[in-house]
Amino acid sequence: MKLIIFLTVTLCTLVTGLDSVYIRQYYKLSHKHRPQHRECQCLNGGTCITYRFFSQIKRCLCPEGYGGLHCEIDTNSICYSGNGEDYRGMAEDPGCLYWDHPSVIRWGDYHADLKNALQLGLGKHNYCRNPNGRSRPWCYTKRRYSIQETPCSTIEKCERTCGQRSFSKYFKIVGGSQAEVETQPWIAGIFQNIMGTDQFLCGGSLIDPCWVLTAAHCFYNPTKKQPNKSVYKVFLGKSILNTNDEHEQVFMVDEIISHPDFTDHTGGNDNDIALIRIRTASGQCAVESNYVRTVCLPEKNLNLYDNTWCEIAGYGKQNSYDIYYAQRLMSATVNLISQDDCKNKYYDSTRVTDNMVCAGDPLWETDACKGDSGGPMVCEHNGRMTLYGIVSWGDGCAKKNKPGVYTRVTRYLNWIDSNMNAVFTKSRSFREPK
């Protein structure tokens, strides 16, 4: 009898103490499932592990700062961003019911038994979440013989962090300088799989944890055929193109929304703007770090002065005659050029429309080039870097009297907002059956 009790206690210790030093020594990595973590569904860099003598027992070994069965809980999160849709912290209000509470499962629209519960942040806990896109995180509380959605008051909204970088560090886009990704943490690299190989296509800018803004001409097809989303990947936090970076985040493309009025028939690229919705295999969006941050969108009526100093960044060619793209992220400074000069002095009013803004180096030594398309032109406004333009087109690279032409982002704020909200609404409209 004592032997049976001893063996039972020992087995329980082995099963429940997976995150201890003992388990790190006696558990092995489940190489069979590691690449996609399909059985464990480990998030946030968690590792699927299995016990040597109990191969059917699989759990996630979480990195520091994360917990939960799938490493889905951010134990360090103390505030929420936006409306808190992506909040995965541990805040709870008095009276919050567990998401797997029988009353919640029976009466609630959102609960731990949904097929997409893990992606919504729901589980065997009562932490505040926002699975339906309300104004802030909430939880279910009892209301007599029913339950109700109650906004959480114990957690506050994070201070706005867009357009801020951890530091500015430049090392030598045409005539520019090598840049660490921390100086341009909103820069995105869009890759296309061609014959089994991921090849760099265009740049982009992270404007929301789930959204990248880029140029429509990157996906333009004269036949109007919709691009195949499955062949694209988006990288964030990447300083060097063809090497793995420990700080990078990799995403699949969930949606590609190009402006319906994009055209290149005038000789320029008009309405050259596109939105990309990104997600990981587990349904997550970008996680903020020193290497990955959002850039601020401009105010609707923002009109910066001529000669305002701005920055461009990308992985494009350093010279128009180069065969290969730059391996490192490059950055350069340009000055805004008046609309009148751009239309009449450097180009013409047919190619340059009011949907565009021009910028160039006074000495014509630095410029965006092939491969920088879709990338950011950011200008400082109210102490934050603001996405004022999207690299669109030009006549050569750093060619005298031929400045770069950029999509004027202020002209598309309503389009950006309406399309992001439309996709959000669509994604919420297909509710899981109870």
From Swiss-Prot:
Enzyme class: hydrolase
EC numbers on record: 3.4.21.73
Signal peptide bounds: 1-20
Domain EGF-like: 36-72
Pfam assignment, any one: Trypsin
Glycan-linked positions: N228
Localisation: Secreted
Disulfide linkage: C40-C48, C42-C60, C62-C71, C79-C158, C96-C139, C128-C152, C162-C296, C202-C218, C210-C285, C310-C379, C342-C358, C369-C397
First-listed, main subcellular location of the protein, grouped into a coarse class: secreted
Spans annotated as Connecting peptide: 159-172
UniProt KW keywords: Disulfide bond, EGF-like domain, Glycoprotein, Hydrolase, Kringle, Plasminogen activation, Protease, Secreted, Serine protease, Signal, Zymogen
Reactions the enzyme catalyzes: Specific cleavage of Arg-|-Val bond in plasminogen to form plasmin
Domain Kringle stretches: 79-158
Molecular function GO labels: serine-type endopeptidase activity
Top-rank taxon: Eukaryota
Peptidase S1 domain ranges (all copies): 173-421
GO biological process per UniProt: proteolysis; regulation of cell adhesion mediated by integrin
Keyword field contains Signal: yes
Catalytic residues, chain numbering: H217 (charge relay system), D272 (charge relay system), S373 (charge relay system)
Gene Ontology cellular component annotations, sorted alphabetically: extracellular space
SMART domains in UniProt: KR, Tryp_SPc
UniProt record similarity statement: Belongs to the peptidase S1 family.
Primary role: Specifically cleaves the zymogen plasminogen to form the active enzyme plasmin.
Name this polypeptide is given: Urokinase-type plasminogen activator
